[in-house]
């Protein structure tokens, strides 16, 4: 469980070894996490088969996230810059709007991960989107991918893929944004996994049409 601020936290997945499943250990883990985060609103991405269990605890479905994968094929695009060249306060403000909660300490570390690339889109002198591509167990993952418009998201996707060309790359897209799905399909990405985004006290007010990729299934 990650506490982002006084009002919001996010649950990662619970993994119980097969021989211990069905004995209540998973529910106990959830209860410990709930105690840890207190009265905050909680978000999570439930894997198939787990949504009903979380609903019994008061969580409600918001939308589906689908992970798409492809071989990274991209190119540099105009107006795309290293995100660290942009004043951090601007990046943090943009992220807060699109994530639904301030996560300043987390964000500073996220965009500075080793062997990762964080890029921003500048339009008319201001930040109009950003994305991060980071190494994972198999290739790379893009997340988050936030942008004011589909063409900006496309430019960011291409520029991020250019940095890791030829490697497997994944993008976790909210299905509630049809333009996010269209981006994945346009670049011939294939769906490989899905999860249900759920919240305990209601979904934060989010510009869903600007969210093309969530940060991760484990972190929100």
Give the residues covered by each predicted segment:
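Short, polar loop motifs at secondary-structure junctions
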Residues: 47-50, 176-177
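Intrinsically disordered, low-complexity, positively biased terminal segments
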Residues: 6-7, 12, 17-21, 31-42, ...
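Conserved catalytic-core motifs of GNAT/GCN5-like acyltransferases
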Residues: 39-48, 55, 60-73, 191-203
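Conserved N-terminal entry element of GNAT/NAT acetyltransferase domains
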Residues: 69-86
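Conserved G/P- and acidic residue-centered "switch" motifs that form tight phosphate/ATP-binding loops
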Residues: 24
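Amphipathic alpha-helical hairpins
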Residues: 29-33, 49, 68, 80
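Short loop/helix-cap segments at secondary-structure boundaries that form the rim of catalytic
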Residues: 53-54, 74-77, 182-184
């Amino acid at each position: 469980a990650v506490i982002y601020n006084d009002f919001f936290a996010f649950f990662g997945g619970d993994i119980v070894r097969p021989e211990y499943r069905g004995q209540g250990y998973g529910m106990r883990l959830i209860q410990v996490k709930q105690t840890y985060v207190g009265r905050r609103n909680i978000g999570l991405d439930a894997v198939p088969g787990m949504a009903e269990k979380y609903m019994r605890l008061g969580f409600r479905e918001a939308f589906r996230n689908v992970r798409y994968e492809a071989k990274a094929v991209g190119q540099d695009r105009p107006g795309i810059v290293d995100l660290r060249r942009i004043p951090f306060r601007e990046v943090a403000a943009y992220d807060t709007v699109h994530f639904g909660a301030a996560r300043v300490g987390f964000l500073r570390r996220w965009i500075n991960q080793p062997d990762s690339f964080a890029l921003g889109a500048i339009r008319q002198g201001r930040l109009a989107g950003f994305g991060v591509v980071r190494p994972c167990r198999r290739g790379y993952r893009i997340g988050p991918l936030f942008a004011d418009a589909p063409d900006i998201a496309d430019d960011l996707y291409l520029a991020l893929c250019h940095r890791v060309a030829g490697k497997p790359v994944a993008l976790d897209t909210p299905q509630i944004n049809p333009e996010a799905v269209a981006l994945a399909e346009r670049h011939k990405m294939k769906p490989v996994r899905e999860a249900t985004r759920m919240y305990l006290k209601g979904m934060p007010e989010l510009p869903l049409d600007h969210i093309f990729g969530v940060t991760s299934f484990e972190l929100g």
